[in-house]
């Protein structure tokens, strides 16, 4: 059995706060994790596969400790959504500005990134990689 199969909402919710703290998580993050794990609202609603990205982000940010950036990263890395552009991510912003120094405002960056639709998640990966001199496996 893979460890991923043993990390469940129920298992996390049953952990004492100290167990999460001992993993190196901050008290605040540990409390957020326990709060989400013990919340009755499903993290992913029924039919989430059919929801558009913005609707899913609106659902996720209702959980305490989940902001737009966290929700976008979840869509990119966990749900493998292909067209997420995270302008709340400093690396993405720096990467876009490296490609087009004139793109300073959010609307200007969105205009640059419009050419990458419907693969803006992959564009984020390339933008992050362009800033990192050491190869990284995602």
Language-model-detected regions and their locations in the chain:
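C-terminal accessory module of base-excision DNA glycosylases/AP lyases that mediates lesion recognition
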Residues: 30-31, 35, 53, 68-138
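Alpha-helical ds-nucleic-acid-binding substructure associated with the helix-hairpin-helix region
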Residues: 4-64
